[in-house]
Amino acid sequence: DKNDFISFIKIRNKHMFDIHENILNKVTNDNHMIDIVKMAEETEDSSFIRLCYNYIPLTFGRRHGDPSRPWNNFDIKVKDKFDKQLLYYEGNWRDIFQNWEALSISYPLALESMLSNFVNNCTADGYNPYRITRDGIDWEIFEPDNGWSNIGYWNDHQIIYLLKFLEHLSRFNNHILINFLDKDIFSYANVPYEIKDFDQLIDDPKLTINFDFKKNDKINHLIEAVGTDGKL
């Protein structure tokens, strides 16, 4: 969907939309995900290429399966405010990639984009944000009186999810995987949680992270100026 793709670029990065507006207007509803990536690669703009790899025209919503858990709130959005079809997904980190692992087997042409989303949404120290959505990543804001407010900063399951995408892509088209290795088109998630130093971890191993409110405010200003790429 041309309009959905253009909307995706605008939300993620306003500057990229302004720079490549002429190219974006040439996209048609008949273009495939692969066509969009090829178009982006011709620009040799690494940020634009990253965005086009990240685009997946899915509609899906899921959080953790237990409805009694306090974080099990999510939207399944299928129509926009004009009652037109909406391509939108959201879910907790592991729920999204658990489902995409299975989806990649039935639709392997999306593997490059799924792998790109995984890599681009990890932090530099190997952790992950709380949620993945069509519009970008999200995290919990720490609330001193709410013990559930900062549960979403983990590195559990990281290796197995990545391994499965790599295995599937290697079997589907190993040439694509090899070419990815020297492409400078990936990013890190800039999550405002920080691991406490070693002495603090020893003092209280149940309280292992700090939330950087100043960093969070700075990121929010970047989002207003640039788009949700301000979280990277």
Segments (PLM) and residue ranges:
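Acidic, mature catalytic/reactive cores of soluble proteins
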Residues: 1-232
